[in-house]
Amino acid sequence: MNMRNSDILKLLNGKEMTGRPVDFKICTDKVHKFISDRRYGAFGEAYVYGWFISKIGDLSQEDIKRLGYSSIEEYLAEPFNKGLTKDSEKKFIQWANFKPNWEVLDKINW
């Protein structure tokens, strides 16, 4: 069973899906060059710099556009639209924390 967009809203509202908090990690270093080659994922060749934002709403419109999306909802919905299931929740949490996980990226034909 595919996760629904309503499940994404639970994440956005800071609720727990797995019995533990979900934090989102993002690289917004303005010096870093983002590329559009999707083989590398939504962040291009970006590295994870290790700072966290506690709420996805802390992303600015500039950050969202830099990632190549019109809205944060569109960005978060993409892995679900590509067929991740509730059974893939643990892997999604890794993806949601923006840790490169090539097994998942390959699975969703990134």
Indicate residue ranges for each PLM-predicted region:
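Structured alpha/beta reader/binder surfaces that contact nucleic acids or chromatin modification marks
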Residues: 1-110
